[in-house]
C-alpha cells in the first residue's frame, strides 16, 4: 500500500474507534464518497446489520438529474436516508464521516439528514 493509503486507512480506523466509545448503543450513519457518487447507510453495530441505506445511484435520484458528484446529490441522499431511517424507528445516530473532512458533500449530506429528522 502507498503511504497515502496507509494514512487514510489509519485515519478511518481512528475515527471508527472514537465513535464506538461514544456511541452508547446508537446506530452509526456511515458515509462513503467516491469521485462520481456518494453512499450512506445507517448501521446497527451491535447486531451487525444495515437499517437503512441510500446512494446517488438510485433510480429516483438519477432521474432527478443529479450526477452524484455534487452537493445537490449529497443533500438528496441525506434526505432520503433520513426518511428511511425514521421510518425504521431510528431517530438518533452517530455520524461516521469515514475519515473524510466534514466539508462539501459530506457536510451537505449530514445537514440534510438533520433537517429530515435524524439527530446527531
UniProtKB/Swiss-Prot annotation:
GO annotation, cellular component aspect: cytosolic large ribosomal subunit
Keyword Cell inner membrane recorded: no
GO terms (BP aspect): translation
Example GO molecular function: structural constituent of ribosome
Any Pfam family matching the protein: Ribosomal_L18p
Keywords: Ribonucleoprotein, Ribosomal protein, RNA-binding, rRNA-binding
Key word Chloroplast present: no
Assembly and binders: Part of the 50S ribosomal subunit; part of the 5S rRNA/L5/L18/L25 subcomplex. Contacts the 5S and 23S rRNAs.
NCBIfam families with a match to the protein in the record: L18_bact
Summary of the function given for this chain in its UniProt record: This is one of the proteins that bind and probably mediate the attachment of the 5S RNA into the large ribosomal subunit, where it forms part of the central protuberance.
PANTHER family given in the database record: 39S RIBOSOMAL PROTEIN L18, MITOCHONDRIAL, LARGE RIBOSOMAL SUBUNIT PROTEIN UL18M
Official protein name in the record: Large ribosomal subunit protein uL18
Organism: Rhodopseudomonas palustris (strain BisB5)
